[in-house]
Each structure stands twice: as structure tokens, then as C-alpha cells.
């Protein structure tokens, strides 16, 4: 019996020793693979990427005009190259022509929006007494209906409802009285020069970027070896394709939003359908806000004044636009920029949370830049766990 126990103990010890040796060999093997991966070059690349992300996190919020100008210049550069290739004119002339067309388009669009907004704002001010009358009438009808329902309710519940309604109205009245309308208007007017300066900086930076992009590219390539230059060429061509695909996809989604909004508003409010569809189309570019910021207050106002039909239709339209934006956008983006819908959605969300609204664009671009660098061999991730 003792001999059998000794044999079993020896067998267990041998098995445990064999298992420990296998685990040790596995750990050592994987350690060598990780050590081969973390070369000096790889470590410098990782440090550079981290420093770039940290710098972007602090610099991007205060340099949005310059970033927007650079992105716009990248978008307009193919038009400049095509014009220069077909007409055989100098690049300076081609840049001037494309820039002029772009500025004229922006100016005409801004003029149309401003005139329509002023016209509609004037009409709202002129009709404000009627709107106030409608709100008062709707409030009186609400009180009358509430009093009729009070008759069948317990006195304690009626008292609680009265207290709640009174407190709500008191809070609403105090919030309205606390708002200094003149101060808000003054603050808005005083901020206009700042916006104008930002817009001028954007236009000047756009023109200079369009002129200097080839020179900046040559300057960058002068610091690179031939092998690295080929990799960067592949990466930049891939990024150019992705940037164009991104804005093409965004434009396609916005066209769908504009068409659906215009068709819906032609049935709901035909007198302002075109203007409101255009405004909603512009605002829908902002991902965290979207069309709901226009349609929801409009619908609530219509419900308050008693126009339940119009208010309900506006809410339905807002829900339809939200569904279209959340379902169509990742698929279209993934098709045109080479990312899966899930990866596109994750990149957009993380970019939005880290960098704000501009991160909606930067998030997918960073993912594409990383995958392009990996495909070009600039970043090598060939280890397995």
C-alpha cells in the first residue's frame, strides 16, 4: 500500500512539474515575441502617437478654424488639380478661381439664410400677440378640463395637484423673470465680431493652405527616406480617399435628411417648408444636437397652442429623421471610408466624447490613419497572445 502511494505521489509530482515547465516555456516564448515587438522604433512610434493625441486633445478645441481650413483645403485640392490639368494654368490662378467659387457659394448661401431668417423672425414678432392669445386660450382650456376632472377625484389628490401645478408655474415664472433678455441680446451682438474674426481667419488659412499644400508636402518628404516616403505616400493616398469618402457619405446622408424633411414639411407647414428644411439640414450636421433641436420646440409650441395635429406630425418627423440618421449613417460611412458600421459608430462616439463635435470627424479619421499606417508597414502589430 505504501508503495502504491509513493508511485501515485511520484506520478502527480511529475505531472505537476511537466505542467509548470509547459507554462514556463509558453511565458518565455511569448515574452520573446513581445520583446521583439517592443523595439526602439516601435516604442518611439507609440510615444509619438501618445504625444500627438495629448497635444490634439488640448490644441484642437482652440484651433478649430485652422483644422477646418486644412480639411477644406484637402477637399478642394482635387478640384484645383483637375482645373490646373485641364486648362494648363498656373496653380496660383487655379487656387484663386476655386477659392473664389467657394467663397461666392458660401456668401450666397449665407445671404439666403440670413434674409429668410430675418423675414421669418419679423413675421414671428408681428404675430406674437396672436401666439400669446393662442397660448392663453390653450391654458384656459387646460384649466377648464382639469377642473372638470377634479370632481371625480379625492380632495387630497386635488390639493396635491394644485400644489404641484402652482409650484411649477411659480418656478417657470421665476425662471422667465430671471432671464435678462436685453443682456442676452447684447451678449449675442457683442459676440458677432468674434465670429467674424474667426471666419476671416478660416478663409485666410484656407487660401494659404490651398497654395502651400504641395510645398508643405515636399518639406515633409525631405525628412523621409525613400522607403518611408513610399509608405507615407500610400498612407496619404489612403487618407485622401477616406476624407473624400467621409464627406461624400456625409453629403449623401444629409441629402436624404433634406429630402425627407422637405417632403414632410410640405405636408405639415408648406409656407416655411423650404427654409426650415434647409435650416434643419444644416443643424443636422452637428451630431450631438441634430434636427431634434428645431423640431421638438416647434412641436411643443404647437401642442401648447392646441394644434395637436401639427405638433404630433412634427414629433413623428423628428423621430423619423433620428432613425434615419442613426441607422443609415454608420452603414453609408462604413461603405465609403472602409470601416465596418460598428467600428465607424465606435470611432464617432469616442471622438465625440474626447474632442467634442469635431471629434465626430476626427474619430474615424484617426482609425483610418492607424489602419493605413499598419497596411503601409509604418506600424507593425504581428504578435499573438
Swiss-Prot record:
The UniProt entry's GO biological process terms, in alphabetical order, are: transmembrane transport
Q: Does the keyword Membrane apply?
A: yes
Keywords per UniProt: Cell membrane, Membrane, Transmembrane, Transmembrane helix, Transport
Which residues, by range, are in coiled-coil regions? none
Q: Where are the transmembrane segments?
A: 42-62, 63-83, 93-113, 191-211, 255-275, 276-296, 304-324, 350-370
| Bilayer topology term | Multi-pass membrane protein
Major subcellular site: membrane
**Gene Ontology CC entries for this record:** plasma membrane
Subcellular compartments = Cell membrane
Q: Which domain of life is it from?
A: Bacteria
Per the record, the similarity remark reads:
Belongs to the autoinducer-2 exporter (AI-2E) (TC 2.A.86) family.
User: Entry's NCBIfam families?
Assistant: spore_ytvI
Q: Extract the PANTHER family matched here.
A: TRANSMEMBRANE PROTEIN, TRANSPORT PROTEIN YTVI-RELATED
* The protein's name in its UniProt record: Putative transport protein BpOF4_00890
Please report the organism this UniProt entry assigns to the protein. Alkalihalophilus pseudofirmus (strain ATCC BAA-2126 / JCM 17055 / OF4)
Q: What is the lineage of its organism?
A: Bacteria, Bacillati, Bacillota, Bacilli, Bacillales
Amino acid at each position: 500500500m505504501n508503495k502504491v502511494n509513493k508511485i501515485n505521489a511520484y506520478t502527480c509530482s511529475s505531472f505537476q512539474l511537466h505542467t509548470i515547465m509547459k507554462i514556463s516555456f509558453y511565458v518565455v516564448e511569448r515574452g520573446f515575441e513581445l520583446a521583439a515587438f517592443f523595439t526602439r522604433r516601435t516604442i518611439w512610434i507609440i510615444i509619438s502617437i501618445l504625444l500627438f493625441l495629448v497635444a490634439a486633445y488640448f490644441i484642437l478645441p482652440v484651433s478649430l478654424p485652422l483644422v477646418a481650413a486644412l480639411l477644406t483645403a484637402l477637399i478642394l485640392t482635387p478640384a484645383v488639380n483637375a482645373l490646373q490639368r485641364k486648362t494648363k494654368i498656373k496653380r496660383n490662378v487655379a487656387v484663386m478661381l476655386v477659392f473664389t467659387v467657394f467663397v461666392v457659394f458660401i456668401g450666397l448661401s449665407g445671404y439666403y439664410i440670413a434674409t429668410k431668417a430675418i423675414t421669418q423672425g419679423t413675421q414671428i414678432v408681428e404675430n406674437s400677440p396672436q401666439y400669446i392669445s393662442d397660448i392663453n386660450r390653450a391654458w384656459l382650456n387646460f384649466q377648464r378640463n382639469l377642473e372638470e376632472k377634479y370632481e371625480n377625484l379625492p380632495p387630497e389628490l386635488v390639493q396635491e395637484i394644485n400644489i404641484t401645478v402652482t409650484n411649477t408655474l411659480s418656478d417657470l415664472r421665476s425662471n422667465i423673470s430671471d432671464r435678462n433678455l436685453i443682456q442676452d441680446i447684447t451678449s449675442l451682438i457683442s459676440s458677432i465680431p468674434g465670429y467674424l474674426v474667426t471666419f476671416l481667419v478660416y478663409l485666410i488659412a484656407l487660401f494659404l493652405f490651398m497654395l502651400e499644400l504641395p510645398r508643405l508636402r515636399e518639406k515633409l518628404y525631405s525628412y523621409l527616406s525613400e522607403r518611408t516616403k513610399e509608405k507615407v505616400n500610400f498612407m496619404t493616398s489612403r487618407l485622401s480617399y477616406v476624407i473624400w469618402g467621409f464627406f461624400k457619405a456625409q453629403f449623401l446622408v444629409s441629402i436624404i435628411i433634406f429630402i425627407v424633411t422637405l417632403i414632410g414639411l410640405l405636408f405639415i407647414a408648406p409656407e416655411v417648408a423650404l427654409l426650415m428644411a434647409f435650416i434643419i439640414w444644416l443643424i443636422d450636421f452637428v451630431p450631438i444636437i441634430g434636427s431634434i433641436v428645431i423640431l421638438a420646440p416647434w412641436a411643443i409650441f404647437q401642442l401648447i397652442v392646441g394644434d395637436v395635429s401639427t405638433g404630433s406630425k412634427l414629433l413623428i418627423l423628428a423621430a423619423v429623421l433620428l432613425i434615419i440618421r442613426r441607422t443609415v449613417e454608420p452603414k453609408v460611412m462604413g461603405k465609403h471610408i472602409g470601416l465596418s458600421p460598428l467600428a465607424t459608430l465606435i470611432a464617432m462616439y469616442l471622438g465625440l466624447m474626447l474632442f467634442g463635435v469635431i471629434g465626430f470627424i476626427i474619430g474615424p479619421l484617426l482609425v483610418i490613419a492607424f489602419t493605413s499606417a499598419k497596411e503601409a508597414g509604418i506600424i507593425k502589430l504581428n504578435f499573438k497572445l
